[in-house]
Amino acid sequence: YEILSGQKEKKNQDSEVSVKNKSSKKLKKPSSKNGYPLVIRNLDSSVEDTIPYVTNYTFSKKSKSLAYTTTGIKDSIQAGVYIKNLKSNSIKHVYSSHDKAKYYKLSLSDSGKNLAFVVDADSTKSYNRPYELYSWNFKNDKAKLVVNKSNSPRGYRVSSDGNLKFSGDETKLYFGLALPEIVQDTLLLDEEIVNVEVWTYDEPRLYTIQEMQLNNDKKKSFKTVFHFKDQKLIQIGSKEYPNSILTDDANDDYALVYSTEPYQLSSQWTGQFSKNDLAIVNVNNGLSKLAIKGNPSPASLSPNGKYAYGYNQVDSTWYTYNIKTSKYTELTKGKMFYNELSDYPNHPRSYGAAGWTKNDKSILIYDRYDIWEFNPETGLNKRLTKGREKQTSYRYVKLDSEVKYIPVNKKILLNTFNESTKESGYYEFDVKTSKGNQLLKGPFRYSSPKKARLSDDLMFTRQSFEEFPDIRISDLSFTSEVVISDVNPQQSDYNWGTAELMHWYSLDGIPLTGMLIKPENFDPTKKYPLLVNFYEKSSNSLHSHRAPNPGRSSINYSFYTSRGYVIFNPDVHYRVGYPGESAFNCVIPGVTALIDKGFIDEDNIGVQGHSWGGYQIAYLVTKTDIFKAAESGAPVVNMISAYGGIRWDTGLSRQFQYEHTQSRIGGTPWEFPQRYFENSPIYNIDKINTPLLIMHNDKDGHVPWYQGIEFFVSLRRLGKPSWLLNYNGARHWPLKMQNRKDFNIRMQQFFDYYLKGAAKPVWMDRGVPAIEKGINQGYELIK
């Protein structure tokens, strides 16, 4: 079946689906308030059935049942909640109310035999809405009241925002309880209301974070369970432990609850946003016990609910916690299951876990290359794959989303990726015998396959720089591969490009890898202009296809190679405390190694990057004149002022970035003032001789846009050739298509002028005065 909502139908169609109210003789228009026509189409027979004025609907997962709410038609269809059997076409009216009633979180159980919903049937304008939770069982004609104000725990109310979920065995219903709404005194006049922000030094969340999370705070609810058999209500989440975790089927006796509040203040500089106190709650009686205090990372529940488990980032160790015995087991202590290549001033993250085997018997965990099987109780383990010897990583492909466990009684499918060659493929593997067979591999990037539910047919894509990721169909052996799409046939009409790996050494002796993109008609005897574009480490994306499009922040490789440019994307390895110097030590010797190959025009080299890439470019041009032109997007140029800034998209303080994450200073300005000074391009602006195009938008929520202003006005003060692009209202990148096109046109004209000797555009010659903004773009070339 297919659902076709009438919500997006044009106005002139409204009359066709409107119904005359017999008493008022007026048309009831489809709207968000009145509801929209819901069209159900049988995909086999194409027969359609239309239900008018539907405001909510949901399907059952394993039966042909549809539940919906409607505002009804007077004297014809009563407003309320209905269940429709799509097989027999029968309809059951399970709840009645007036057409102004509002319904929330309509939820059918998997079998379709149980339904739950929250309703607000109060027609008054009370600020504290009297939400009620109802449930229906197929044995009953009408839905029954489960929870309302009278039987809610003291100080709580039914939430209209908390999700409703039946346990897999349908004996329990999980829902949300909320604290009373905070409402303003309606008797106050506007001139009596004080609008002041009070920022407090020791409150858990910075005021700006509270503002960004205000809507979530208003919708906050605490997980609660209702047991149908004994009509018992047990609250799971609470103000002390507001967050809850259940197993996927929610059948088990225990839930995890946790609180990050004790660590929210320090997370602003540590970056440990998930650090929490973890407790266990028995969902049958509400009894709880503290499991792990100060758990550095989030925990999960094993599929069968026997273990809490996770990765302790501080100890770099995977652990399990037996819920019944309270036994804590360090599974990977002393082993390298942490990110071996991490160069942040922080504890390294993990490579993740593949999942669990049946009955929580074992857990499969990834290291850099391989899959290991661990006994969750004892920690005994064995390596299943042999990837480290070949520098090839193996990762599990889940083909059936309905299966909770990794099957060990049949072969499974793995993705493979070779770190050295960047080749990928598919691998058939037997967990029991630890033996496998490479089914497919090559110099491509293969997607994660999707399997048909009722057959062994797979759908996947493969791509490379030269090859578009068309859709392919195959069986599980990949011996009957068929390409079923041809999305980009016009590519053959263009000078595209080729991608290859390049190797060199940094100034401090580290072997490095990068991507080298050449025009399709490359001639090694010619000299080509070079564009350097980088961020951190990108060489693993060697075989990614890059279709021409006006990107929001980066050069488009296919576009520039077709115009005769060579592109170089070097990987950067960082040393804590010296991010700018690290970029110099990696990028510049890569550029000189390319020049030595003889096909690069060393007098026409440009560099481009955005955000962290924009910062590194701003730093590089203070240290070298090797670049004839540079585009620096959303750059930080003053690490001291940026350290005290706000990431306005989230409200977070920027301190954690410098102390523990990407900016890699490794401490505060008062601990390492020299590091902040040395890594800030603003203090060496006078040494820049490279013309600069800067893009920084006034609503950037990642990097404060005054950083771009600091950069530009300093260059302007010194008379350095520079231009600043600010797309009004745009955030970290221009997202509107017209702005993206404009940015790419200006960047192309900028690089063509400096690196290819093209004519200068008007906007670079005289700018675009404010009086001409949006009228004259200045693209015209001066001849």
Predicted regions and their residues:
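Beta-propeller folds
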Residues: 1-457, 463-469, 473-474, 761, ...
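Hydrophobic/aromatic beta-strand patches that form the interior of the parallel beta-sheet core
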Residues: 3, 67, 224, 234, ...
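Composition- and surface-driven signal marking solvent-exposed, interaction-prone regions
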Residues: 53, 96, 187-188, 236-239, ...
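Short strand->helix junction
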Residues: 73, 101, 122-124, 521, ...
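Active-site lining segments that contact anionic ligands and/or coordinate catalytic metals
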Residues: 161, 351, 360, 366-369, ...
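Glycine-rich His-Gly loop
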Residues: 260, 417, 463, 533-537, ...
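Cap/lid segment of the alpha/beta-hydrolase catalytic domain
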Residues: 334-340, 344, 478, 486-604, ...
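Active-site-proximal cap/loop segments of hydrolase catalytic domains
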Residues: 547-783
